[in-house]
Amino acid sequence: MFLMVEKKPVPEDWPHIVGDYVVGDEESPVAVVTLGSHMEDEPVKAGAAISGPLHTENLGIEKVVGNVIANPNLRFLVVCGAEVMGHITGQTMKALHSNGVDLETGRIIGATGAIPYIENMPEEAIERFRRQVELVDMVDVEDPDSIAARIQECVVHDSGAMEEEPLILKVPEIGKGDSEENT
């Protein structure tokens, strides 16, 4: 017997920050970043709400954070796929989730990537992201079956939506340029 967990309505325009991603069931508790690997819609078919690559450790991470906090149903972030050389986006995402950001410099604490700075987001957004999702570390895992199994495991352990409402960032810099380099 499945217990129904509480879900919240997802904002109509979610995901509102432009990027290279595929959207699935918006009420799913799972978001997936595939780092340097392109897995098309495989994570979404496995049950993820949103999935896409993450090439940069600054604007790309800001886009992920902005779209995650805008959907309170998201409770897991699966970080999988090949690490991006130089940018090291997987390690940077893990550092952001574990350590946050130096408020004076904007540098992600403990990140080893080339330019790990969050410049377009308030502290409130970063802290909300860190509270909202559990990070599932699958860096360097590219096997679709392993990733699908972990997504399903997260779906089974869904604790329901955050009590807080969606946090929609009105940051004009995020999403500008629209280029692949900024995903």
Swiss-Prot record:
Domain of life, per lineage: Archaea
Species in which this protein is naturally found: Methanothermobacter thermautotrophicus (strain ATCC 29096 / DSM 1053 / JCM 10044 / NBRC 100330 / Delta H) (Methanobacterium thermoautotrophicum)
Enzyme class (EC, first level): translocase
Cofactor note: Binds 1 5-hydroxybenzimidazolylcobamide group.
InterPro entries noted in UniProt: MeTrfase_MtrA/MtxA (IPR030688), MtrA (IPR005778)
Pfam families xrefs: MtrA
The EC number(s) this enzyme carries: 7.2.1.4
Protein name per UniProt: Tetrahydromethanopterin S-methyltransferase subunit A 2
UniProt: 5-hydroxybenzimidazolylcob(I)amide binding residues: H87
Cofactor: 5-hydroxybenzimidazolylcob(I)amide
Stretches assigned to the Cytoplasmic side: 1-101
Swiss-Prot/TrEMBL keywords: Cell membrane, Cobalt, Membrane, Methanogenesis, Methyltransferase, One-carbon metabolism, Transferase, Translocase, Transmembrane, Transmembrane helix
TM annotation in the entry: 102-118
Functional pathway: One-carbon metabolism; methanogenesis from CO(2); methyl-coenzyme M from 5,10-methylene-5,6,7,8-tetrahydromethanopterin: step 2/2
An individual GO BP term: one-carbon metabolic process
Function as written in the Swiss-Prot or TrEMBL entry: Part of a complex that catalyzes the formation of methyl-coenzyme M and tetrahydromethanopterin from coenzyme M and methyl-tetrahydromethanopterin. This is an energy-conserving, sodium-ion translocating step.
GO MF entry, a single one: tetrahydromethanopterin S-methyltransferase activity
Membrane topology, from the record: Single-pass membrane protein
Subunit structure: The complex is composed of 8 subunits; MtrA, MtrB, MtrC, MtrD, MtrE, MtrF, MtrG and MtrH.
One GO CC term, this protein: plasma membrane
Extracellular side: 119-183
HAMAP family (UniProt xref): MtrA (MF_01093)
Cell compartment(s), UniProt: Cell membrane
Family according to the record: Belongs to the MtrA family.
